Swiss-Prot record:
It comes from the Bacteria. The keyword RNA-binding applies. CDD domains: S4. Keywords: Ribonucleoprotein, Ribosomal protein, RNA-binding, rRNA-binding. One of its GO terms (molecular function) is rRNA binding. Belongs to the universal ribosomal protein uS4 family. Residues 96-156 form the S4 RNA-binding domain. HAMAP family: Ribosomal_uS4_B (MF_01306_B). Part of the 30S ribosomal subunit. Contacts protein S5. The interaction surface between S4 and S5 is involved in control of translational fidelity. InterPro entries: Ribosomal_uS4 (IPR022801), Ribosomal_uS4_bac-type (IPR005709), Ribosomal_uS4_CS (IPR018079), Ribosomal_uS4_N (IPR001912), S4_RNA-bd (IPR002942), S4_RNA-bd_sf (IPR036986). This is Small ribosomal subunit protein uS4.
Length: 206
């Protein structure tokens, strides 16, 4: 399956939430009507079956983190093998993706932009270039911007946006040095309450 590169508003309207919130601070354009599903007539959403709710939640989270279907299923399988709650494990694996950590640290204004920075070798992990967006960051890892990439205007703009949001407990960032430390794996209470990971577990458990 190819990665979706179409209008972000369309996907967000499909899921009924802003999937691409810029650095957790700036929402999509006000013209993007979240109350109606995409389409010519913008029909309002009908009542979904249990399966429909489970599928929508899975699609919402998958698109939020920018993960393809096969990769998302593999994350679920890995989460199920780890000791603890499968749903929480799944979210923690997604949060540990390098592109997500770059986004959380404010170096990319969206996860998509953060993924580009990683792919273009603008990101260092413990002083070494890593260009794999799915790379799993570990507690204590230092993630920073490569020296020759520090003058990119989009990175500076992203850090300005990130300054508007609340500080995350599991990440420490030195904006001046364009460097941050992944202090610990976030607890479930640290993550969005708008995600119902139990629906995803129910879907894949069938």
């Amino acid at each position: 399956m190819a990665r979706y590169i179409g209008p972000k508003c369309k996907l967000s309207r499909r899921e009924g939430t802003d999937l691409f919130l810029k650095s957790g601070a700036r929402a999509l354009d006000s013209k993007c009507n979240m109350e109606t599903a995409p389409g010519q007539h913008g029909q309002r959403r009908g009542r979904l079956s249990d399966y429909g709710l489970q599928l929508r939640e899975k699609q919402k989270v998958r698109r939020m983190y920018g993960v393809l279907e096969k990769q998302f299923r593999n994350y679920y399988k890995e989460a199920a093998r780890i000791k603890g709650a499968t749903g929480e494990n799944l979210l923690q694996l997604l949060e540990r993706r390098l592109d997500n950590v770059v986004y959380r640290m404010g170096f990319g204004s969206t996860r998509s932009e953060a993924r580009q920075l990683v792919s273009h070798k603008a990101i260092l992990v413990n002083g070494k270039a890593v260009n794999i967006p799915s790379y799993q960051v570990k507690p204590g890892d230092v993630v920073s911007i490569r020296e020759k990439s520090k003058n990119q205007l989009r990175i500076k703009g992203s850090l300005e946006l990130a300054a508007q949001r609340a500080t995350l407990e599991w990440i420490e960032v030195d904006a001046a040095k364009m460097s941050g430390t992944f202090k610990s794996v976030p607890e479930r209470t640290d993550l969005s309450p708008d995600i119902n990971e139990n629906l995803i577990v129910e879907l894949y458990s069938k």
